[in-house]
């Protein structure tokens, strides 16, 4: 792990694409870069680096939690994308119960 979000909390937010990821991380020499913020699963490969966003374990456009498992061995790694279905109705109802500010904006963006 080179840099975690708590060390660089204000990195630029860009629309995920191979071109944007290559440009954003051009100063990094890595086989794998795991990124986030966007709640959708993305995987890009420019033959030198794989850029992987495992998605969101909550707010996304389906009733599932999405995450990734990265297994690292001596000279290689593998990525497994996992989707776990769950009943998100209680989760969504909690936004009203807790009076979450900007609920409409959040739902428009992520559900």
Language model region names:
Residues 41-43:
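Residue-level recognition of beta-strand microenvironments
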Residues 1-32:
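Conserved catalytic scaffold of divalent metal-dependent phosphoesterases
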Residues 31-37, 51-55:
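Active-site neighborhood of phospho(di)ester-bond hydrolases with catalytic His/Asp-centered motifs
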Residues 6-16, 36-38, 100-103, 108:
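Charged, low-complexity, helix/coiled-coil-prone segments
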Residues 45-111:
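Acidic, His/Gly-rich catalytic cores of divalent-metal-dependent hydrolytic chemistry
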């Amino acid at each position: 792990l080179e840099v975690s979000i708590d060390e660089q909390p204000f990195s630029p937010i860009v629309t995920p694409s191979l071109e944007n990821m290559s440009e954003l991380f051009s100063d990094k020499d890595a086989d794998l870069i795991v990124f986030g913020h966007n709640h959708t699963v993305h995987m890009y490969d420019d033959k030198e680096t794989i850029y992987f966003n495992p998605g969101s374990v909550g707010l996304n456009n389906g009733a599932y939690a999405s995450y990734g498992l990265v297994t690292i061995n001596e000279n290689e790694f593998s990525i497994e994308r996992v989707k776990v279905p769950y009943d998100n109705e209680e989760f969504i109802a909690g936004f009203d119960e807790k009076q979450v500010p900007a609920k409409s904006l959040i739902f428009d963006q992520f559900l």
